[in-house]
Amino acid sequence: MAPRTDNHPRFMATAAAVARLGFGRTAPNPCVGAVLVRNGKVVARGWHERFGGPHAEVNAIAHARRRGEDLSQCTLYVTLEPCNHHGKTPPCTEAILAAGIRRVVVGTRDPNPQAAGGIERLRAAGVEVIQGVLEDDCRDLIADFRLWQTSSRPYVLLKLAQTLDGKIAPRPGVPGTVSGLRARRWVHRLRSRVGAVLVGGGTLRADNPQLTCRHPRHQGPQPWAVVATRRLPTADAPLALLRRTPERAIFLTSAAESRSQRATALLDLGCRVYGLDEDAAGIDLASGLTLLRREHGCHHVLVEGGGTLAANLVAAGLADEILLVVSPRVLGDSAAPASFQGRTVHSMTDALTLRLAAVRTLPPDILLQLRPS
């Protein structure tokens, strides 16, 4: 029995949730999720788990076969158009046809011309294909992949934690964290999925962060710890980054500062130091981000800096996704740093406008997922 058409969004939403399990593991390929539905129930699921591994459709089909499902009676929901070319794996279209699946529901088309054409191939073989279900959500799933088709820089996730009145920390000298335990654990899981964690010099000096993933289940390599700063720290500074893991530290600084004695001492310590051009807002972050992907293979960069860095990134169009953790607390202290600051705004038309993509709870906090409008 074919699923009712009003159930298509529900099953596609399930496929999208499954797809997110692969985030950070599939680059430079996209995250893709698939579910197989029979008689109104999900009977199998699969996702693209790692780069070079089987695609979501193949994993879902394998799951269904292990469960003894009759694939000819199933509808396949997949967030991205099935690929139709030989790459590291055979075409998913051929796996679908070989399985005898007769109905496929697709979220969005593949923006990669080398892999596109799957919808036409399936239709030519007599498969019913429905496309465009939850298309905006499915396009958001591959926002990083779409960026990589046209840009040489990594996908940038800007993470901020703030109180209800927009403060990211108490005033200087006052200890305390804004977000709760669940939100902090979520951040460490996120760090395990990115190639680098980036902060500004102010955050380095004020917070002395480790910039590591300390999730108990994390077993992979640590992300690069990146600091964007016009003035480098001295090699003997009591910073956790320099004392514990200098070999994974990257400093993005000005061209002049990269030739300083401080830079030489950091290089001797095992750090990487790169000199970049400057403008009124600081060092050239766009070039620095491109360098991280080119030289260090960073497809995703998580930015956890302060309000000035955050505002500069959003204003420059370099923040592809903003992850805002909001704590149900109010500081009411004008001396406490704000989540976005440093800009001069003369009217509301100068405001940076974002689009709310999703909301989830991390009790007692909430997480807002925003994207450029």
Protein language model features and the residues they cover:
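Short low-complexity, flexible loop/linker segments enriched in glycine and/or proline
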Residues: 119-121, 144-147, 213-214, 289-291
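Enzymes that bind and transform nitrogen-containing heteroaromatic metabolites
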Residues: 2-30, 45, 88, 155-157, ...
